[in-house]
């Protein structure tokens, strides 16, 4: 559900006891962690048990599994996840009691107040860029607070309340949440139509980024990728308005750009040029050109904040990934199994490029779960086209999330658009059968990749178990 943003946004310390409805999610759990670290009393509930809930309990939060009206008792503020329905008993009870209701965006703004905020926005690459910047700053000796949409491997968490003045935050545009923040600096990775279930039109989606630009501190700056047409338009607009803006990219026109890019296996090495000055090399241990662009944005931001190139480069080289971003789940019988959150055509293409680099002479076997009916209706054909970069594709049923089914909008829109011979594409509604298809089609040296923003992430362990059961030495055609 959507909770309106209040006219007056209070700092976290003024919210009293805070109860989170949907505390186990990536967004709310991070905010809860930060509040707990600052001594704020926190409680919360979620539909099912999870490792996240157990971790929050260990930090001092009172966490419930299941939703009941009485669980908001004693709270002063109730933060509500967008995944929660309006008839949720805790939300209904909070409204009846007249408690302060906040959306996630307002709660994040509350913990960011008083800090120098760097907000990372964009259609794709937000989580990775936020993570890279955080690790790079840490290697410069800084201790920034951060809130990220996935667990940072180096920290083992998605959020941290640091001792420094900086707060690095992933700024989600999906429901307009990023228009609540007032950052000192902003990074925009790209701007490409998405979340049209909320925005209605591509023009409205792009206009939201223009409004986001206007929220940047006049003393601050924008970093954006000039290789991306949407982000390049934002750079032009910023300069027209007299705002400080830095372009990054692979193109010759980028102020901070990568040259002499070499990609071998899981590493990418490139030379950084900043307005004609050669600063040195960066080597990333995560594969794919899209990660190079994310690293350039993080690097350019760190440089503009006054940190030395050598330390930033060392931090970027140490970045080992974020959960669900080309995450290696395991290897059995010479077959590696990866998982990734990619669900938009451009994200799918980027991850398959990275997978091709990782696979080398091996083949790529993909299970893709389309995310949301509205996105599949609009982008289904483009998703299918992007999946053509794999060798074997299994398309699962749509993960409908918060939407209702729509007649005629099915995973077939994706499967029918995959430009591979029919014997290499399977439309499979059965979860267990999907795992079987992947194992049946993969052979030693191949790479299995599960893709999607839904519960397809849970498929990896099943695939590994099937591979384990088969044992080594299985001969396949």
What are these regions (language model features)?
Residues 1-107, 229, 244, 254, ...:
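N-terminal leader/targeting and accessory segments in enzymes
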Residues 434-466:
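A glycine-rich beta-strand to alpha-helix segment
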Residues 18-20, 78, 118, 144, ...:
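Conserved hydrophobic helix-helix packing surfaces used for dimerization/oligomerization
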Residues 3-19, 27, 33-38, 184, ...:
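Nucleotide phosphate-binding/pyrophosphate-handling subdomain across enzymes
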Residues 40-47, 222-226, 365-369, 389-400:
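Short internal beta-strands
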Residues 34-37, 57, 71, 82-226, ...:
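Phosphate-binding loop of NTP-binding sites
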């Amino acid at each position: 559900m959507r909770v309106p943003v209040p006219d007056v946004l209070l700092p976290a310390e003024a919210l009293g006891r805070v109860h989170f409805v949907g505390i186990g999610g990536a967004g709310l759990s991070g905010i809860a962690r930060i509040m707990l670290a600052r001594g704020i009393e926190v409680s919360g509930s979620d539909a099912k048990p999870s490792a996240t809930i157990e971790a929050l309990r260990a930090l001092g939060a009172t966490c419930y599994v299941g939703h009941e009206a009485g669980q908001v008792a004693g709270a002063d503020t109730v933060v509500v996840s967008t995944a929660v329905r309006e008839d949720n008993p805790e939300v209904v009870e909070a409204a009846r009691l007249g408690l302060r209701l906040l959306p996630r965006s307002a709660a994040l703004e509350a913990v960011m107040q008083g800090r120098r905020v760097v907000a990372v926005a964009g259609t794709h690459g937000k989580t990775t860029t936020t993570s890279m910047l955080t690790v790079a700053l840490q290697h410069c000796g800084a201790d920034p607070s951060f809130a990220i949409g996935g667990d940072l491997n180096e920290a083992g968490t998605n959020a941290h309340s640091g001792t420094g003045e900086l707060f690095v935050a992933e700024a989600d545009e999906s429901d307009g949440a990023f228009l609540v923040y007032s950052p000192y600096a902003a990074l925009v990775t790209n701007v490409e139509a998405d979340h049209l279930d909320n925005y209605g039109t591509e023009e409205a989606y792009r206009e939201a980024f223009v409004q986001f630009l206007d929220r940047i501190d006049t003393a601050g700056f924008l970093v954006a990728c000039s290789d991306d047409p949407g982000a390049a338009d934002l750079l032009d607009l910023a300069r027209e308005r007299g705002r400080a803006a830095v372009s990054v990219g692979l193109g010759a026109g980028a102020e901070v750009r990568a040259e002499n890019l070499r990609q071998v296996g899981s590493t990418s090495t490139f030379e950084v040029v900043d307005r004609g000055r050669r600063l040195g090399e960066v080597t990333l241990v995560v594969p794919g050109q899209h990660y190079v662009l994310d690293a350039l944005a993080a690097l350019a931001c760190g440089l503009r904040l006054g940190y030395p190139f050598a330390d930033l480069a060392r931090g970027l080289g140490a970045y080992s990934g974020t959960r669900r971003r080309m995450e290696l789940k395991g290897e059995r019988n010479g077959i590696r199994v990866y998982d990734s959150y990619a669900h938009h055509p451009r994200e799918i293409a980027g991850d398959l490029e990275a997978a091709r680099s990782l696979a080398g002479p091996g083949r790529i076997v993909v299970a893709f779960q389309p995310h949301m009916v509205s996105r599949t209706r609009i982008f289904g054909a483009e998703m299918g086209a992007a999946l053509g970069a794999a060798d074997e594709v299994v398309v699962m049923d749509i993960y409908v999330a918060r939407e209702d089914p729509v007649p005629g909008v099915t995973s077939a829109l994706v499967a029918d658009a995959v430009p591979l011979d029919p014997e290499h594409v399977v439309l499979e509604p059965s979860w267990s059968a999907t795992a079987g298809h992947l194992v049946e089609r993969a052979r030693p040296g191949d790479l299995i990749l599960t893709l999607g923003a839904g519960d397809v992430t849970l498929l990896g362990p099943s695939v590994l178990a099937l591979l384990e059961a088969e044992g080594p030495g299985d001969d396949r055609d």
